[in-house]
Design a protein with these regions (language model features):
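Extracytoplasmic
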Residues: 1-111
Length: 111
């Protein structure tokens, strides 16, 4: 569900099973890229989320569990990388978990 919090619109997850969010990204140069997720976690405990970095053919290039720490009422950043050099092209970043209730995402920055 999209809603505004502190003048920023984010995607907020409620109760449910098998929650996910996906971003489509494009890169220009062959290099390792930083992936920075702008998120909020209001649950009072860290939430583990499976992150997959997928190429245009559907091949998973990186799969990792990211633990999003609690962020009482504030947007914070969580960083990881593509893990390896990737070529210019189109990719997907997929975050999924059994339960993402209390977790929200505002943006994904790729640098």
């Amino acid at each position: 569900q999209k809603k505004e919090h502190r003048k920023q619109i984010g995607v907020f997850f409620g109760k449910g099973k098998s929650n996910s969010i996906e971003w489509n990204i494009s890169t220009g140069l062959a290099q390792v890229y930083a992936l920075r997720f702008k998120y909020m976690n209001t649950t009072g405990k860290p939430i583990p989320v499976l992150m997959k970095f997928i190429d245009s053919k559907g091949v998973v290039l990186k799969e990792d569990v990211l633990n999003f720490p609690e962020t009482p009422d504030k947007w914070k950043m969580m960083s990881t990388t593509t893990g390896t050099f990737i070529n210019a092209g189109h990719y997907k970043v997929l975050l999924s978990a059994e339960n993402m209730d209390g977790l929200a995402f505002d943006a994904l920055e790729v640098q």
